[in-house]
Amino acid sequence: MQSPSIHRNTGSIIQPTVTPDARAATDLQERAEQPRQRSSHSLSSVGKRALKSVGKLFQKSKAPQQKAATPPTAKNVKTPPPASNVATPRNKARESGFSNSSPQNTHSAPKSILRNHPNQASSSGAQTHEIHPEAAPRKNLRVRFDLPQDRLERSPSYLDSDNPMTDEEAVANATRQFRSPDSHLQGSDGTRISMLATDPDQPSSSGSKIGDSDGPIPPREPMLWRSNGGRFELKDEKLVRNSEPQGSIQLDAKGKPDFSTFNTPGLAPLLDSILATPKQTYLAHQSKDGVHGHQLLQANGHLLHLAQDDSSLAVIRSSNEALLIEGKKPPAVKMEREDGNIHIDTASGRKTQELPGKAHIAHITNVLLSHDGERMRVHEDRLYQFDPISTRWKIPEGLEDTAFNSLSTGGNGSVYAKSDDAVVDLSSPFMPHVEVEDLQSFSVAPDNRAALLSGKTTQAILLTDMSPVIGGLTPKKTKGLELDGGKAQAAAVGLSGDKLFIADTQGRLYSADRSAFEGDDPKLKLMPEQANFQLEGVPLGGHNRVTGFINGDDGGVHALIKNRQGETHSHALDEQSSKLQSGWNLTNALVLNNNRGLTMPPPPTAADRLNLDRAGLVGLSEGRIQRWDATPECWKDAGIKDIDRLQRGADSNAYVLKGGKLHALKIAAEHPNMAFDRNTALAQTARSTKVEMGKEIEGLDDRVIKAFAMVSNKRFVALDDQNKLTAHSKDHKPVTLDIPGLEGDIKSLSLDEKHNLHALTSTGGLYCLPKEAWQSTKLGDQLRARWTPVALPGGQPVKALFTNDDNVLSAQIEDAEGKGLMQLKAGQWQRFEQRPVEENGLNDVHSRITGSNKTWRIPKTGLTLRMDVNTFGRSGVEKSKKASTSEFIRANIYKNTAETPRWMKNVGDHIQHRYQGRLGLKEVYETESMLFKQLELIHESGGRPPARGQDLKARITALEAKLGPQGATLVKELETLRDELENHSYTALMSIGQSYGKAKNLKQQDGILNQHGELAKPSVRMQFGKKLADLGTKLNFKSSGHDLVKELQDALTQVAPSAENPTKKLLGTLKHQGLKLSHQKADIPLGQRRDASEDHGLSKARLALDLVTLKSLGALLDQVEQLPPQSDIEPLQKKLATLRDVTYGENPVKVVTDMGFTDNKALESGYESVKTFLKSFKKADHAVSVNMRAATGSKDQAELAGKFKSMLKQLEHGDDEVGLQRSYGVNLTTPFIILADKATGLWPTAGATGNRNYILNAERCEGGVTLYLISEGAGNVSGGFGAGKDYWPGFFDANNPARSVDVGNNRTLTPNFRLGVDVTATVAASQRAGVVFNVPDEDIDAFVDDLFEGQLNPLQVLKKAVDHESYEARRFNFDLTAGGTADIRAGINLTEDRDPNADPNSDSFSAVVRGGFAANITVNLMTYTDYSLTQKNDKTELKEGGKNRPRFLNNVTAGGQLRAQIGGSHTAPTGTPASAPGPTPASQTAANNLGGALNFSVENRTVKRIKFRYNVAKPITTEGLSKLSKGLGEAFLDNTTKAKLAELADPLNARYTGKKPDEVIQAQLDGLEELFADIPPPKDNDKQYKALRDLKRAAVEHRASANKHSVMDNARFETSKTNLSGLSSESILTKIMSSVRDASAPGNATRVAEFMRQDPKLRAMLKEMEGSIGTLARVRLEPKDSLVDKIDEGSLNGTMTQSDLSSMLEDRNEMRIKRLVVFHTATQAENFTSPTPLVSYNSGANVSVTKTLGRINFVYGADQDKPIGYTFDGELSRPSASLKEAAGDLKKEGFELKS
């Protein structure tokens, strides 16, 4: 009889009807026989009905509001006609938190699909299940199954039944019993309980693998019907029936493969791009038409196996060489296939390789093949069967609601389904299945025996028989499991005909004979294999970890082994020899899946799509997150479901609402990890987008959120189900926004680009709350705030609000065509236009500038040829997209107004500001003077030092007892402020000590103190520096001459911040070392406002501020101590808040010193930089704005602002950069001088240039962009000699010496051809100063608006940024160039010809106008560059410096000039009449240059630098310790270590009793160090190695923090080359120099070339990078771990100096290659140089965009010389056009690349 069905939607019981069955009887004895295992059973009859029935076990739940099904009575049960195909009944909602149903299910506890028999217990852990016969209206044969044994019993009614049941009826009836209401397969409420999901991506015969997530993973489906599809025999894979013909592979004479017969559109091009690249050839192949598998033998001896049918394609590679290739010439090879093996024949013999079986292909494609050729897979908890007729996947009829975890193939060839703790054989119509509590893994042997691993802490192995029908009669055997003496836990199990294999969580292998189950010992005790089953001569575990097992087609067990590169390989376990056989790489594989017919959500609508700038596109469809895949150019499901709402934050991140909880989405570009090995890539290497559910947003407690609007994860607005609206920010408690003005309840919230909050209410109203109102934490602002109505778009009702592209507010019109999206721009509603998918503001500008420039790659080199055109002094004329001439003239030359020329105004302002300072910094200057006055008053007051125990810290501690619990907050805040002031006073004094005595020009890096605050090593240069500092103070008339050291000592004595008083101790030490300090006068004379020459004036003022505030804190303590008991302390709390947040927190000196400024000069430079760009963006006719509009194609400033925002948001890599520069200056040159009697030379030349430059650079940082605003003073001086000779007429016609033509009026036309050469030496120097800061992503829009509006002063702009650092840099260049010129010209003198009879002793002056053409070539013979850079604030310091030697032949420039000149000459007297022979007179000539020049240049430069950052050491926190412990626990998986880690993490541990929080942290850290003290860093386990390294470095920093030392954050040595081929090849000069010097370490190019030789993937990537349009290649080295340990040791004891570190970083033996990068910089430069003689003016601006074209990042483990693998990112990692086309064609056919 049939169980009742449950209606899909209502949950009501549907009672089936009963009809008589008149089928003939069959003998039950025949059905009791064991069926043959290799037989195929069609699901169209008995099997299908049985599958549909037993499939009830795995039905997906419905919503929990459905009522439980009531078991029907016998009279209501009817049997359907045998020919009918009864629909599968529905399940009631299963209570699983991981179901695919409505969100209400997400918190329900999962239950098993089977329940224990109440009267039986199973010691084995396997639960016994029975299905009892039900009453029937006639005497039918009744069969009872005792599950999972499946024991058959005859019902008493069978003997006298007139109509015994057929086999089909017996099975169908039995399976119906499985799902009857009183069956033990039911839940307690009469409904079937569904199951938890396991990881579907790694199927194995065990049903699980190591590393399976404990969390929810989509379940799988059951059972299939017999289709008309084709079937392949297991060994030779010949097609049996109904197959679409498959292509074959051909090799040409050169070994190049031809895939043209693969007729699926897009497939042949895809295979060509992966398997037939120019360098790929093959030695042999085996391929036949209509055969499922094809084989290719690679040139390196590895075998490729290509398996294709119309449901999937897979290409995998053998793990080891199938044929060992020796020598350069490979042998002649022939391949022959026989069953499941491939034979490789050479002259030296035959080698045989086993081909991958069904389980191998299923492992990577998730498509399983049954006995009769049916293909099945699980997708989104549902079973699908492939229909070869329609080439689509279909859910078998009646199984639409049946859920499974996964499918796998057993050693007997059957397909098994696992669901929670149950395993069912899907290949048998009898459906044998078994359940064991807490099932972890299972495996089925060829003889149908199954091993089931259960339990986590206490584990057991159950051995049972899975044979259909009679398997239940076989006794089960259970053994407890003990691995490695109880130290290890089992994770996976594999069973063969003779052996049991087990893998533990550490990846080690165990084995035992199956006979071990025959003994009486209740436990199976095993030790890991050491001598047997080794890989590369090493036991498994460590680098090579067993993660699971699968079965070959012969039933043998194959171990899945993950290597250190993260690749999984299958290796057959040879039980005879106890060895691993050569296997197959299952990770680096090409996989295509046909996804037609699989349930997929539709693409998200426009309203549900978010363009997240650099992060890509995401969307929401049917409650599921979708991501845009750029390869096939379509939407793909991200696997995140049950999402209620998706919204964009102002920070360009996505946030989701799920089940009333607010989460961030983690969206980032994903670049595949590639193993460093000798094989090419089969898997997709193009970048994709990775989407993961992030952490729940903090601060919402247990509230159920129903609407929200996000600025960032720290600042947002949330509305809960109680209609409570709250505003959240990082530094304040949540503020309830109970603000009037709304009508109705809020339905949705959203922000506009200004962060104004908009709300849509239930009444259809739209309202706005200004940013200032909802972000304010002041009560007064909230009381004044009010919601204001906003006009609806067109007066139409709004359905929902969104924040879409560019953070613009959008609204969806209700019931409008085309979804009716509108956006609010500039207060007006406009139709919403979706941003194009591939639009990228940064790439667009980069491409525009690149297309405008004229550059070419020189063939067979890595060099770039560049063309430049200059016309009438204007450069950049060659560009196709440049500013109009009128705009250029107004910006750089002349503005037709009465306004003072900009360059003159800038020069005047600069002189004034250097003298008086900046008006906008007046408050800072005044505060400095006031602080020094207050410090003097403390000094002069002469107060007594406090008695012992009366320091500030002790007094605050004493308040705890006085104030009690109600004063705890006040006491804590007092101590926090005191500690901050004391620590910072120490930091400020240490900063002074580090700079005092430093001689920058002498490269003296340390002052009295080194970077750690310890005394630096004394040196002559330091002593000289101290004397200079002392002398400078004495000569400085702005200095007060006071003894600041004495004033500070007196103040610290009086204030006494603590008993230790470390600042006073440090001050005493510095004084003893010769520190002499004064401070500026309170009133600076001559109107100068401040002392700009004081090196650390702001540091002194900040030190004074700290001490003055400590004095005020002491006065406040006096008031607190005088409080009577039970007094109100709120007034004092307000005073403390005012002191902390206003008096101290908003003090201008604190504000600017927190930005990293230590002196007024640096502050003014940063201020000036910001001011310059505020003016640049505000004025549309400024050179910067004009040039940017030309570069970006913007029509006006508003459009330019939008594009600049987009550019900043699209900065993706840390190496991407946007640069702006404004420059102006003056050039001086000497006239053309001819010495007396030196007509052909040598002639001296000289020149000088002075420039003022302003620079803005932007690059990506974590959570925002980093901006550099820098001012630069640059100058150069050049000098040289030239020579030349006039060759006309003699050069052309020696017999006709006439060289001039009389044109009358005493004027002469003189033609001339001249050749000349010159050598010039140039010395250039520059100094930069400025500020570096970060702008968070959410503030980019507002920051750019502030720049363009220009309403704020620079200090206000700086206050809006975060993480400021001061910037200072110096650069020195020396260049030696040689040039040659060929000049053909003609000139007419403007003055009369000199009279031959003129006085020979008189000077003569003449003028001439010339016109002509000149060709020139210039070669840079030698260049030397050195520079230093410092960025710092009081928490961090970055140092950068050049490490260059003189380099030769760096640049060649050749070109031509067409010019007109007006020149004047002075000729010195010779004393000889002109008519008489005599010496050539000396002359000086000056001329302008009007005309045009065309130049071509090639640059071949190499620059080296070191760069390192030190941070002030921080003590480890509780969160840091938890993260550290977690990492150690994940690396060390043995039970002993896990237990000890858990003990240390227990807060109730006795070792923490009575300790303060900081002491508890120290005790736990000590415990971790003790635990791992005796464990050396393992060389065979990278994860453990890294975990121990993290522990070691954390302990070093924690100890260093106690001494206030700094620790290294990162360090690098970089080599940059404009010749891209320099990445992998050395120049001839470098090779010569390397041969004559002792080079103990190979050069970078040699290392890279060796890497390329070892890895063809890497070689191909580097060749692509070298062949790109890149303009710069860079090799980055980083310290090896051994060097890091030395540096950490020096940081810990305070002896490591910057010079020491710099020297260490130059030792290549201690460095490893970290990164290889190729950039392309596109520059839009427009400059003007006035064509005037002797003195000229220059003005210009440029925009540059640097894009990372290719970047290879290496990853290292315990081996510091050989990388584990690498990633490839940058623009070249994006899918190519050909890949997109192939993937798009395949997508149309239903095939998608598996990523």
UniProtKB/Swiss-Prot annotation:
Biased composition (Polar residues): 1-18, 97-109, 117-127, 174-191
Record keywords: Host cell membrane, Host membrane, Membrane, Secreted, Virulence
Subcellular location: Secreted; Host cell; Host cell membrane
Residue positions of motif ERMRS: 1787-1790
Low complexity: compositionally biased ranges: 60-75, 203-215, 1467-1487
Gene Ontology CC annotations of this record: extracellular region; host cell; host cell plasma membrane; membrane
Record's subunit section: In planta interaction assays, interacts with the A.thaliana protein phosphatase 2A (PP2A) via direct interaction/association with specific B' regulatory subunits.
The family this protein is said to belong to: Belongs to the AvrE family.
Protein name (record): Type III effector AvrE
Gene: avrE
